[in-house]
């Protein structure tokens, strides 16, 4: 009996210690589930529609030494800010790496110590997100940043329960309608950079076509040049990006078609390499990507080394290094632009945009330095196009430049439901529906990332063929 009593006393003491020890833990409550060309590549011929009398021929690609020249002047005291970062990947893939580098750069600039940033990597499910949020709050983080929409529910729930902390979801789509003053969404206007990269691609294709450098396998049965594109999921983020890229190409090279392969994963190096290899073997002249890893670039570069000259448009700066021969340029986001603004505003306790989106004009997106095999006069052409994009003379999704099912789109086609549910939510009772069509002096365009920052251009425009990786053509 004494042994039993002693055991009960010990068990009781342990229970008390556990209760006391756990009294201050932050637990975010999860909702109950109810989802050939020559090696030099510098032929003298250029497309006939290129202006020959441009005064300014400066390189339009990004030069990091010119970015954020005023950063050094922004050294606000950021004492008291502790940042928790939840990443869908890590430094081995382009997307998360770009956020890591941008957060570190912005933090150093305004004086946030490295010890005041805590990282959670490869958080790619809702359940993992809830756990990561709870742990970061327990550790005293008062600004939580997540870089994927799959993490959105966990941060929104935490924002409701923790009004004194701030929560950011990159690519989230609920800040505009959430009613939460401490919840933020952000996304760059990367579609603008993808359009510019499409112009670069179109210039090269026009050069190759004019010189007779494309094999018969590089054309489809309608005599259109075949270009491949490797995307993640069939969502607005992917559709907006490859549609912009296609329209950029088509603005220079009319007889072009885009073949999109979905890997149906955010990052799978084997799947992405398989998609690239399949496109190369099928005869695609050029391949672009949205997918996150460098395996596409590496696969194309290997083909190049073997004499199979397939050209490449990348996504992120790491791609340029991995495909130094094949790459023409890459579309990139400079997330430090956002994080500098966010950290400064919060440290100074100033109001900040809850649904942030910036692009070429603000330096938030760009294309990288042009590759050594671009067509002649590409820099001049891109500079001219970029100027039009930034001064409102040209819009990526001008509705006169594309059709859907052979028809021009109208308001009904361009309606955006800002309360549309994702795969884990019930539909809202009162939907907030707005038209994305906007008029300007020259016509009408679909205004992407204006009604909210996250992409919503999800129209399947003519000239683009979509397939899952497992499907045969």
Regions found by a protein language model. Give the residues of each.
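Gram-positive cell-envelope targeting signals
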Residues: 1-53, 57-68, 75
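A residue-level marker of the well-folded mature domains of exported/periplasmic proteins
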Residues: 40-473
């Amino acid at each position: 009996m004494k042994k039993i009593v002693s055991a009960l006393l010990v068990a009781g003491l342990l229970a008390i210690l556990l209760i006391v020890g756990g009294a201050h833990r932050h637990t975010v409550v999860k909702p109950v589930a109810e989802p050939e060309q020559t090696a030099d590549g510098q032929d003298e011929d250029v497309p006939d529609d290129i202006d020959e009398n441009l005064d300014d021929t400066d390189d339009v690609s990004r030069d990091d030494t010119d970015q954020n020249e005023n950063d050094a002047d922004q050294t606000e005291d950021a004492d008291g800010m502790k940042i928790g970062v939840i990443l869908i990947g890590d430094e081995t893939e382009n997307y998360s790496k770009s956020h890591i580098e941008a957060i570190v750069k912005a933090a150093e600039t305004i004086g946030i110590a490295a010890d005041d940033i805590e990282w959670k990597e490869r958080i790619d499910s809702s359940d993992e997100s809830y756990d990561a949020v709870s742990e970061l709050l327990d550790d005293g983080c008062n600004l939580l940043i997540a870089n994927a929409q799959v993490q959105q529910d966990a941060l929104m729930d935490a924002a409701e329960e923790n009004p004194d902390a701030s929560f950011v979801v990159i690519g989230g789509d609920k800040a505009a309608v959430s009613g939460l003053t401490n919840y933020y969404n952000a996304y760059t206007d990367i579609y603008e950079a993808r359009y510019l990269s499409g112009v670069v691609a179109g210039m090269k294709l026009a050069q190759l076509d004019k010189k007779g450098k494309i094999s018969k396998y590089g054309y489809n049965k309608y005599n259109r040049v075949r270009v491949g594109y490797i995307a993640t999921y069939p969502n607005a983020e992917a559709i907006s990006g490859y549609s912009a890229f296609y329209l950029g190409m088509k603005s220079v090279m009319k007889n072009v078609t885009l073949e999109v392969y979905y890997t149906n994963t955010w990052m799978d190096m084997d799947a992405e390499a398989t998609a690239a290899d399949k496109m190369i073997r099928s005869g695609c002249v050029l391949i672009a990507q949205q997918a996150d890893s460098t395996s596409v670039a590496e696969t194309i570069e290997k083909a190049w080394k073997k004499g199979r000259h397939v050209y490449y448009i990348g996504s992120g700066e790491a791609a340029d290094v991995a495909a130094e021969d094949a790459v023409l340029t890459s579309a990139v986001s400079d997330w430090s632009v956002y994080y500098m603004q966010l950290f400064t505003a919060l440290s100074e306790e100033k109001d900040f945009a809850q649904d942030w989106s910036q692009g070429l004009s603000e330096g938030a997106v760009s294309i990288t330095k042009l590759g050594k095999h671009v067509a002649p006069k590409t820099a001049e052409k891109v500079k001219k196009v970029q100027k039009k994009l930034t001064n409102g003379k040209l819009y990526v999704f001008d509705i006169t430049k594309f059709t859907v099912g052979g028809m021009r789109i109208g308001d009904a086609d361009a309606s955006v439901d800002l309360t549309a549910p994702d795969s884990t939510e019930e539909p809202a009772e009162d939907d907030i529906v707005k038209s994305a069509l906007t008029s300007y002096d020259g016509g009408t365009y679909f205004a992407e990332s204006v009604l909210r920052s996250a992409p919503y251009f999800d129209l399947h425009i003519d000239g683009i063929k979509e397939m899952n990786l497992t499907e045969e053509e």
